[in-house]
Curated annotation (Swiss-Prot):
HAMAP family assigned: Ser_tRNA_synth_type1
Keywords: Aminoacyl-tRNA synthetase, ATP-binding, Cytoplasm, Ligase, Nucleotide-binding, Protein biosynthesis
Signal peptide bounds: none
Reactions performed catalytically: tRNA(Ser) + L-serine + ATP = L-seryl-tRNA(Ser) + AMP + diphosphate + H(+); tRNA(Sec) + L-serine + ATP = L-seryl-tRNA(Sec) + AMP + diphosphate + H(+)
Main subcellular localisation: cytoplasm
Pfam families in the cross-refs: Seryl_tRNA_N, tRNA-synt_2b
Domain notes per entry: Consists of two distinct domains, a catalytic core and a N-terminal extension that is involved in tRNA binding.
Disulphide-bridged cysteine pairs: none
Chain's gene name: serS
Protein's name in the database: Serine--tRNA ligase
């Protein structure tokens, strides 16, 4: 959420930042609503002040036995009692309109973010490792997995398209990957493990920016009785399935003031995530690349404004370390202004090399690390008490540390062997009971 005072102070800068994101200027429209809101608030406050003053004057007039003046003042107060609710309603309506308009506008990019329209304008930052050479043609994970327990047919019977059932060695391998990531972040990177609810309220979704703009991309759960309830009750009492643990973790500080000594607050969770993928029709229809349900390790940091940029670099390094220890080839890119997420000021994507994708392999996103400034904090009313005693908005950051399903794909395709088996990376073998190869079982 944007601060209308900042827009008022620098409308040209606000519009210029929106233009960098490919959006039209909004300051004139927002400031017109703000002017109407401020005028309505002033009129309401003046009416209240006049009513209070007139009420006092009535007592003075009666004391002075000035019946005519007392009568006139009483008539004035009666009129104010009639008009004040209308003035208060006008102020509330303008306030809600401004909040609604502000809530639909994305965060502003930092100055160092590269300008661009889409993913083709993203900038490569660095690369780790190199592509492996194979004595055979690498196969995609869905072909490898067909003999190892990757079952899309059963999943379709259970839930429809974009779901998968993993069995035997593959189920164990995915569990091992997630546990390895969680252990790394909690024992070496200083993150506190959280096991959050998977169902959250509307205001929680609003806090991190999923609502109102991306309502169609969410899965919603409702009690049976609400299916026959009026539409308004259905929307207010529903619960959303988290599209990422970022939603739950970040909102742990909503409507609160934490002490500066508690920051930075670093949180992590390994959870299922649920996405409707409303805009992904026809994309990545094969395999596990794009699923309605998937597992992810999420990293969230709550910081002061002065430390958020350094924390962003630290978070990226933590996510990268996962892939380094798995010895997976990857690259880091800085997203351009036209490809950033709604709540982000700046985003790094980590793309892992998948040798079985496309014609000869492809880089695919496995992690996205973003710094959001105070954008989410304003939506959540999340603040910290600084050393001077004044409450200020925190800065929030989030990143995948990493997507477990896509890490499984990368391991399967990178460590595939000619006989169709998968060599288990060294770092995962302790989580697999010492198993070194996942192979088809007789």
């Amino acid at each position: 959420m944007h601060d209308i005072k900042s827009i008022r102070d620098n409308p040209q800068g606000f519009d210029a930042a929106l233009t960098r994101r490919g959006l039209s200027p909004q300051s004139s429209h927002l400031l017109a609503i703000d002017e109407r809101r401020r005028a309505a608030i002033l009129a309401s406050e003046q009416a209240q002040a006049r009513r209070n003053a007139a009420s006092k004057e009535i007592g003075e007039a009666k004391k002075a036995k000035d019946d005519a003046r007392a009568s006139a003042l009483m008539e004035e107060v009666a009129k104010l009692k009639t008009t004040m609710p209308e003035l208060e309603a006008a102020a509330k309506q303008a306030d809600e309109e401004l909040a609604r308009e502000l809530s639909a506008i994305p965060n502003l990019p930092l100055d160092e973010v590269p300008d661009g329209k889409d993913e083709h304008d993203n900038v490569e930052r660095h690369v780790f490792g190199a592509r492996r050479n194979y004595a055979f043609a690498p196969r995609p994970h869905d072909e490898i997995g067909a003999a190892l327990g990757m079952d899309f047919e059963s999943a379709a019977k259970l839930s429809g398209a974009r779901f998968v059932v993993l069995k035997k060695g593959l189920a164990r391998l995915e569990r091992a990957i997630g546990q390895f990531m969680l252990d790394l972040h909690t024992t070496e990177h200083g993150y506190t493990e959280i096991n959050p609810p998977l169902l959250v309220r509307n205001d929680v979704m609003f806090g991190t920016g999923q609502l109102p703009k991306f309502e169609d991309d969410q899965f919603w759960a409702v009690r049976g009785e609400l299916l026959i309830a009026p539409d308004e009750r259905l929307k207010t009492e529903r619960l959303g399935l988290i599209p990422t643990a970022e939603v739950a973790l970040t909102n742990l500080v909503r409507e609160s003031i934490v002490d500066e000594k508690e920051l930075p607050m670093r949180l992590t969770a390994l959870t299922p995530c649920f996405r409707a993928e409303a805009g992904a029709a026809g994309r990545d229809t094969r395999g596990m690349i794009r699923q309605h349900q998937f597992t992810k390790v999420e990293l969230v940091s709550i910081t002061t404004p002065e430390t958020s940029k350094d924390e962003h670099e630290r978070m990226l390094a933590c996510a990268e370390e996962v892939l380094r220890r798995l010895d997976l080839h990857y690259r880091v890119i800085t997203l351009c202004t036209g490809d950033m997420g709604f709540s982000s000021q700046k985003t790094y994507d980590i793309e892992v090399w998948m040798p079985g994708q496309g014609d000869g392999g492809a880089f695919r996103e496995i992690s996205s690390c973003s710094v959001c400034g105070d954008f989410q904090a304003r939506r959540m009313d999340a603040r910290y008490r600084a050393s001077d005693g004044k409450p200020r908005f925190v800065h929030t950051l989030n990143g995948s540390g990493t997507a477990v399903g896509r890490a499984l794909i990368a391991v399967m395709e990178t460590y595939q062997q000619a006989d169709g088996s998968i060599a288990v990376p060294d770092v995962l073998q302790p989580y697999m009971g010492g198993l070194k190869v996942v192979a088809a079982e007789p």
